[in-house]
């Protein structure tokens, strides 16, 4: 199984890990076996099954940062944002300046409609990683949804000065529209169409 895992042959690794688990081959083994099994499942996008393997690893070796990170990822990809946040926050305790963790906590909070709290994480990300466009996108969107239109426009304009995507022009257009600047909105919408090809 480890050989197949090292060669990124996920299906073969999963097959062997499943057989080992069926015959009791994992009994007495370390959490690492369940982590490897979970990782192979995760790579095949079998997130619910990966979560089960990672949870078994957690019972053998509680609060392992690698395991918690992968539980968070799988819960997020399975759209269980509240539980994902729980595991991301465990990782955050051990690595408070991990920019990926900060971003994903903010993103999960935004998915749950907790925009004010999400903003705090996106501002933290912008502080940790100077000129962070993905933080600016989060700030722009959460500000827009929270009716903080001037703040939203400030961040969309910063993005547009750097590396804008079509969606950035579109969102800037939405902000300009609700602020009553139809002329500016139409320019942004036009740029969104051009940028999207």
Q: Which role does the model predict for each range below?
A:
Residues 177, 182-197:
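TPR/TPR-like (Sel1-like) alpha-helical repeat modules
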Residues 25-28, 62, 96, 130, ...:
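Short coil turns that delineate tetratricopeptide repeat
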Residues 29-32, 66, 100, 134, ...:
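Start-of-helix register in tetratricopeptide repeats
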